[in-house]
Amino acid sequence: MAAKIISGINIAKQIKQNIAQKIAQYIVNGYRRPGLAVILVGADPASQVYVNSKRKSCAEIGIESKYYDLPATITEVELLSIIQRLNSDEMIDGILVQLPLPEHINPIHITEAISSDKDVDGFHPYNVGRLCQKIPTLRSCTSYGVMKLLESTHIDLSGLHAVIVGASNIVGRPMAMELLLAGCTVTITHSRTKNLVDHLSSADIVIVGIGHPNFVKGEWLKQGAIVIDVGINRDTYSKKLVGDVDFLTAEAKASFITPVPGGVGPMTVAMLMQNTLQAYEHHLQAV
C-alpha cells in the first residue's frame, strides 16, 4: 500500500490563515502591523526566489516587510551596521539574512549580531541553546516545520526511533533537539557514518537533508516508516525539482512521506511567519 502524502502546502496554508487572523485582530485593536526586515546580499537566483516567496507570504498575511537588496561587494562591517540599526528599530520585530552569504562575510558573525529576540530564523546561539535546554523560544524554521508535519500524522512520537541524515546547523542539529523534545530516540548520521543502511532500516522516522538528489532508496527503509524529505535539488536529466529521497521507491515502503516540491519548503516559510508573529507579540508585551 502506497504511503499517505503529507502536504506541506495545505498545512502551511492553514498556519498562515491562523496567523493572518491574529494579525487582523491586533490591527482592529489599534496595534501596528508586525515588521520583518529581509536582507539579501548578492544576486544568487535561488536566494532571490526564496526571498520573494517570504515577502509574498508577508504581504498575504499582513506582515510589513522591509527589503534590503544589497550588492555582493558589501563589506561585513557595513552589513553588521545595517543589522545594528534594525536591532534598534522598534518597528522591526524580525530580521532575516538570506543564506548563503558571499565568502568574505562570516555567517556566524552575522547570525550572532542579530538580536536574539528578532532572530526569526532561529539560528542565534541563544535560541539554539534554549531549544537544547527544553525551553524553546524562536525555533529554527525548517525543523519547527518538520515537527508540524509529523504532528499532522496524529502518531504518538514518544519512544519512536528517528534517524536524521545530515548534521547541518540549519537542519540536522536543531532537528535532533526537536525530536528529543518530542520523546524520540534520535540517531544523527552524516558523511562519515558507517553502515548508514543499518541505521535507516530500524528507523520509525527518517528525516533527510543532505543535498544529494534521490540518495535514500526505498529498500533501505523499514516498512511503515515516516519519511520527511528536506532536500530540494534540480535533477540533472529531467530538470525537475527532486528531494534527497528516491520518492517512488520510498513511497512504496513508507506509511507517510513528504513530496518535493510541496512538502517541507512551504512549512519553512510558514514557520518563519509564525516566528515573526511570536517576536511581534513578545515586543508588544515588553512595551
From Swiss-Prot:
Family label: Belongs to the tetrahydrofolate dehydrogenase/cyclohydrolase family.
Annotated organism of origin: Haemophilus ducreyi (strain 35000HP / ATCC 700724)
PANTHER family reported for this sequence: C-1-TETRAHYDROFOLATE SYNTHASE, CYTOPLASMIC, C-1-TETRAHYDROFOLATE SYNTHASE, CYTOPLASMIC-RELATED
Disulfide linkage: none
CDD domains reported for this sequence: NAD_bind_m-THF_DH_Cyclohyd (cd01080)
The entry's keywords: Amino-acid biosynthesis, Histidine biosynthesis, Hydrolase, Methionine biosynthesis, Multifunctional enzyme, NADP, One-carbon metabolism, Oxidoreductase, Purine biosynthesis
Catalyses which reaction(s): (6R)-5,10-methylene-5,6,7,8-tetrahydrofolate + NADP(+) = (6R)-5,10-methenyltetrahydrofolate + NADPH; (6R)-5,10-methenyltetrahydrofolate + H2O = (6R)-10-formyltetrahydrofolate + H(+)
Enzyme Commission number: 1.5.1.5, 3.5.4.9
InterPro entries noted in UniProt: Aminoacid_DH-like_N_sf, NAD(P)-bd_dom_sf, THF_DH/CycHdrlase, THF_DH/CycHdrlase_cat_dom, THF_DH/CycHdrlase_CS, THF_DH/CycHdrlase_NAD-bd_dom
Pfam families reported in the protein's UniProt record: THF_DHG_CYH, THF_DHG_CYH_C
Protein name: Bifunctional protein FolD
Keyword NADP: yes
